[in-house]
A protein has these predicted regions:
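RNA substrate-binding interface of SAM-dependent RNA methyltransferases
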Residues: 25-26, 102-199
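Active-site/ligand-binding-proximal alpha/beta "capping" segment
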Residues: 198-234, 243-246
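Short acidic/polar active-site loop segments enriched in Thr and Asp
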Residues: 66, 136, 243
Length: 273
């Protein structure tokens, strides 16, 4: 009974949609994953005690862990650690490190999502799902028709919020390297930093997305806001070497376009098969 409640709590906490077989002995239960803001020791000596800090301790309390449960820790530097929970207090928890696994689950195709600011709920969705799909970087940009206006302290707080979403998405999907969520820039600021191949999704473009990229090189994918890019913005982007490309015959919403394009690139050139 306790095992059933434990698995249900993990599923709810991490918003998982598992295969029903995970509830039976056919498939082993995956231990819950937590991001450690504190660097984990390398090399890992089995039996080493490690203090996981307040954030992880709070999660363990919410899940009603009492000690003895096995969890997975990662710190963003690659690989993951199996650990056994030993002591939990209100502001801290101690685990015993069991072993280090150098496993990586990064996509073979490197994609930077350059996303024009959208409404708050849409941005949260875009950040979460793009991390799950395998992007390596996310660059939020302010554009003429963006509905979300951010500057100064509001922008800094929102970026911290997005970074927390990226961490939570990595905990859920199994990634051991957290994608970089950059600070908010204007379109022109971002264009000045353009290096390598960059593609702007534009319904009226002549070339297709898949026919415009070299998947062996990093790709920057530029997605417009709810109202789209202005003609002046597209002209400036093209002048900086950005390639307009179409993605199917339909005009997609800003929260759909980037995610669908990332999934298509991952299916054709990456590991989404």
């Amino acid at each position: 009974m306790r095992g059933d409640l434990y698995r249900a709590a993990i599923i709810l906490h991490h918003e998982l949609v598992p295969n029903p077989a995970t509830f039976f002995s056919i498939t082993p239960v995956i231990s819950p994953r937590f991001f450690s803001a504190l660097p984990l020791p390398r090399p890992c000596t089995p039996g080493t005690a490690f203090n996981v800090g307040e954030a992880v301790a709070r999660h363990l309390q919410v899940l009603r862990f009492a000690g003895g449960e096995v969890i997975t820790l990662f710190d963003g530097a690659g690989g993951e650690f199996s650990a056994t929970v030993e002591n939990i207090s209100k502001r801290d928890a101690t685990v015993k490190l069991n072993r280090f696994d150098p496993v990586e689950r990064e996509a073979p195709i490197r994609i930077t999502l350059v996303q024009a600011l959208a409404t708050a709920d849409k941005m949260d969705l875009i950040i979460q799902k793009s991390v799950e799909l395998g992007v390596t970087d996310i660059a939020p940009i302010a554009t003429a028709r963006a509905t979300l206006k951010l500057d100064g302290e509001r922008a800094e707080k929102r970026v911290l919020h997005w970074r927390a979403i990226a961490v939570a998405a990595c905990e859920q999907c199994g990634r051991n390297r957290v994608p970089v969520v950059h600070g908010v820039q204007t379109l022109d600021q971002w264009l000045k930093s353009v290096r390598g191949q960059s593609v702007l999704l534009q319904p009226l473009a002549e070339k297709s997305l898949l026919g415009s990229v070299d998947a062996t090189k990093p790709i920057a994918l530029l997605i417009g806001p709810e109202g789209g890019f202005t003609s002046e913005e597209i002209t400036r982007a093209v002048a900086h070497g950005v390639i307009p490309a179409k993605f199917g015959p339909r005009t997609l919403r800003t929260e759909t376009a980037g995610l669908a394009a990332i999934a298509a690139l991952g299916a054709c050139f990456g590991d989404l098969v």
